[in-house]
Amino acid sequence: MKKIKKGTIEVICGPMFSGKTEELIRRLVRGQIAKKNVSIFKNAVDNRYSDEYVVSHNQNKIKCQPIKDSKEIFDYSKKIDIIGIDETQFFDLSIIDVCNKLANDGKRVIVAGLDRDYKSIPFESMAYLLAHAEKITKLSSICMICGGYAYFSQRLTDDKTQILVGESEEYEARCRKCFKP
């Protein structure tokens, strides 16, 4: 009997500082423990901590392949069982076809990213990936105003561009009541 490869798409989403990258790294390390071939990618625009590593806010890290175009993943994925993609919201809509093709080829694809921008508008690529995913994990953070569960990323600067790569100087997590779009 022929062995059927069962690919999947998993999405880890939530606001800034909710542990998305931490969870992605955890799942990939578990894959390594299970003797799976694992690779992680990030958009080259994300150079906050390192060009060569995906790094969580807690400084946990895993070696990665920075790419400018999501289609570059195909160049590295032939012998990979589990593919991680961090900060997925930085990629254009072609990431959807890339993830679907990889999953259809039997790969386990785990993406992590913000589901909404600083105005609470969904990132289009993430919205589509959420619709295509077999497994969704929505994380929360802690509201920096009241201490409640936070699902929003509050921008602290006047910059109006949708994508602003930043940290706690530019963003903080907020609950619905304390969020000011």
Tell me what each language-model feature is.
Residues 90-92, 118:
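Catalytic P-loop NTPase motifs of RecA-like helicase/translocase cores
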Residues 142-164:
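Short recognition patches in nucleic-acid-associated and regulatory proteins
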